[in-house]
Amino acid sequence: MNQQYSAMRSNVSMLGKLLGDTIKEALGEDILDKVETIRKLSKSSRAGNEAHRQQLLSTLQNLSNNELLPVARAFNQFLNLTNVAEQYHSISPHGEAASNPVALAKLFTRLKEKNFNNGDLKKAVNELSIELVLTAHPTEIARRTLIHKLVAVNTCLSQLDHDDLADYERNNIMRRLRQLVAQSWHTDEIRKIRPTPIDEAKWGFAMVENSLWEGVPAFLREFNEQLEESIDYSLPVEAVPVRFTSWMGGDRDGNPNVTAEVTRHVLLLSRWKAADLFLKDIQVLVSELSMSECTPEVRKLAGGDEILEPYREIAKKLRTQLSNTLTYLEKQLKGEQVLPPTDLLVDNEQLWQPLYACYQSLKTCGMEIIANGQLLDILRRIRCFGLSLVRIDVRQESTRHTTAISELTQYLELGDYASWSEEEKQAFLLYELHSKRPLIPHNWQPSAETQEVFATCKVIAESPQDAIAAYVISMAKAPSDVLAVHLLLKEAGCPFTLPVAPLFETLDDLNNAENIIQQLMNIQWYRELIHDKQMVMIGYSDSAKDAGVMAAAWAQYRAQDALINVCEKEGITLTLFHGRGGTIGRGGAPAHAALLSQPPGSLKGGLRVTEQGEMIRFKFGLPQVTISSLALYASAILEANLLPPPEPKPEWHQVMDTLSDVSCKMYRDYVREQPDFVPYFRAATPEQELAKLPLGSRPAKRHPAGGVESLRAIPWIFAWTQNRLMLPAWLGAGAALQQVVNDGKQDVLAEMCRDWPFFTTRIGMLEMVFAKADLWLAEYYDHRLVDKNLWPLGQKLRKQLSADIKTVLAISKDEHLMADLPWIAESIALRNVYTDPLNVLQVELLLRSRQQQYSDPQVEQALMVTIAGIAAGMRNTG
């Protein structure tokens, strides 16, 4: 094992020992001995010792009800600490960061070798746009209070990572680590109540405050240094290529808990938090900017010649304005009726202009080193976060708009809008969009659902323009779906044009996306409205649930390609918004690989992508990790735009068409046509029990009485991740690949794997899933939990998985899974030792829970802990 991994393993070992000491202190030697025995048996079982595997099973099966919870908690906490050690390893100078310098430096070297001139590079840098959308359905299982403790553990690991520590310093850090591990152990890791949408929004704001606020300026500083070194170019102060948006408090698709009032509250809360953070920043400037020499502009802003410390005076004025803004927003949040103060900050320019004048003045007066300190960081925060902190997207399902307009047209005795043809809908909508009179009568009393749709549009209309980023229409199926939202916003009196993004998420809708956008582009009124800019969202999770990963991936690729072509032809700047999840079954892939695997030209309009639940913490949970993640994104976008992958050959297209058709048919044959599938799914996974876990504010099902088709993509994936079959992430794909091999096209597949990033990524993602899947554990779930009549189905699926692994290895020409990514393989192996006992224990708990007439709180709690622990072990939930 090389030196890099040994540093991580020694951290894991140290944290494990501290946890062991804590358990011993809290519960005594016997429980610790039991936990240690289970851990050693698990390690030996993983190494292939069958006798120890049987011993592991019997030990866990025979735990008393009193032992269940401590054992489950021990392994859950082991995994949380392992993940911290792994996250630290990725940024440690003695770990992954030692051999993986910031990706940008390597890219600039490659571009120079390919004779790119600096002008091309500067243009690409100036056009760089990364918008990360923090989503509103956190699959983040860990409670916020525990996350704070784990972040503090990471800080301790960083402090220990020095060779020159004095003994007393090391002792102090170790004492702090022991305290943090003990605090975590004595804290209940499972939420007792579901978070509200406002709780979720606060979670997002905490992520900004604790990590992104420091991480973004630090990344831009690093990025700027790389640019100066490589191409002698400095990033303009006003150019901030990174922005953050949130769905928390704005995404009402299928979530009745997100109301117009909730959105209004979250928008106020967001502005309050921004004012609070900027106030702290400005306070630093008040204490630091004591210089007197300045330009006439700054002298005038400060209040004239008699002001001795002009920069400090300007900072003090801003401090007063921010303080007044904070007080006003606090009163509004409490529901008090209050008039806005005359110096209320509502526009980013109010903050930007005086500070930018100070920046220019300091540079002009020879104090560039001071200008480029804290002041520059604040200016960049204004451009990235602004007075809204994070903008929000509003998302709603298309049928809600149709129903609202239909209710209105029937009240006005114009007929039933919902039953009209697409042509009739468009004609009506365009007529009303051109009309100068209002459509909605003042005395009309709509239904509560329709009133909610109108109220949401009113909240948008009354918000500062920079507070709302876009209106996303889920399940968009026709041009009228887009026009309908524009009409609703017009009727609400929205004073600005909000980008409206149709979301195409089923196989049929993806295939029809080009046609819908082309129809919209043919409407003259629409063309004038959008100023040659269109956003389209591609849904990854629902398409994969609908058709399987291979067919969904190809439909997404083809839809993007077609949309790029239609927008290019029409002279439209297209922004593709990717609705990816953290898991493979929901489109997740390592960021760099995922971006390079998209169609050529897909990133010209910038990148807009959702960051889901627990992935937000893994990618952006610490300032240093934020720097690495943003550098990866920036590098991948620049590479994709400057060194686009070659257009795929027609033969590759044909092979993908075959793979898509064959895999989709097999996937649907199982999931939709196989009568035993739903009973098997419900028995072999903790799907029913998952509903009890207070995960996010959104219900697990769109329709409570429905089957698999009504399940949201997150619990669908989550359930299969728990029993280690990982079915949604591979079903159909391997069988389709084998069929193409049988058709004599193995050489073509090898060529695609070698030369086409899209296909290389598909194979790589399958390998990662196969590395996390586990045949014996999946079989164990079946034999203990599933009716014998359903065993043949499970057997068939496992046999298919086994065959698929061989097929993929034959195509990639690797001897074992993840051969190209030893670091990820190492990480999976490290966590398996702790995850396996949780899987075995979960089976036992499911069995006891399902057999009991009355629920036992200890069993229920232990079951929830195993669910959380396996999620931590798999590093994926939904």
Swiss-Prot record:
Keywords: Carbon dioxide fixation, Lyase, Magnesium. GO terms for biological process: carbon fixation; oxaloacetate metabolic process; tricarboxylic acid cycle. The active site is at residues 137, 545. Its cofactor is Mg(2+). InterPro entries: PEP_COase, PEP_COase_bac/pln-type, PEP_COase_Lys_AS, PEPCASE_His_AS, Pyrv/PenolPyrv_kinase-like_dom. It comes from the Bacteria. GO terms for cellular component: cytosol. The keyword DNA-binding does not apply. Its EC number is 4.1.1.31. It catalyses: oxaloacetate + phosphate = phosphoenolpyruvate + hydrogencarbonate. GO terms for molecular function: magnesium ion binding; phosphoenolpyruvate carboxylase activity. Forms oxaloacetate, a four-carbon dicarboxylic acid source for the tricarboxylic acid cycle. Belongs to the PEPCase type 1 family. This is Phosphoenolpyruvate carboxylase. It comes from Photorhabdus laumondii subsp. laumondii (strain DSM 15139 / CIP 105565 / TT01).
